[in-house]
């Protein structure tokens, strides 16, 4: 329906298969977002879906003589195993040290204008650290740094918080992520991003304070909203301004 109705519009981006997962149970009170029981969604499952949906989108655009639109395709484990199409098997834990041990392959989608989705929340996705004598998180920075040298990526969701959209605000960790997405990676990619979320609910990830929408007070921003507003003011200075954080911490006061 959407591709049929808007095939003549050249400003649409499609995202299919958002955050593929098969989470059956969440019962960790310390990490309410964490899936404690699941059956993994593999790249093969996602690719089968994409190979059915993308031709339908393309058909509508070709019918009106339009160029194929950009289609962002979800990746396994909530859009975090971004290079699953280049690896045999699944590496659990989102870690470069784990994924590097898997054999290489090329199972990329055979369409033009395809990008691969990546989501991050700095409360859980960062450089990794030891907890209680064992590795609790893996080095996602290092992993995505390398992936950006191999695949076109769109960060279609990120927040400044924990993955449930709440909890502390992690300014420094988010700075580091946006620096990486701003060309400071193996492929020198300038990665487009979308922030979660433009809303006025009580979660820490909301850009606006409760009641701001009803009052149409778009300056009533939260800590997260103030940060994103300043980020966009930097990014929107002009297409030649790709320095972002390379020389100074432009995103923080």
Describe each model-derived feature in a short phrase.
Residues 3-13, 17-191, 200, 206-233:
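Extracellular glycoside hydrolase catalytic/binding regions
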Residues 222-253:
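Aromatic- and carboxylate-lined catalytic core of secreted/periplasmic carbohydrate-active enzymes
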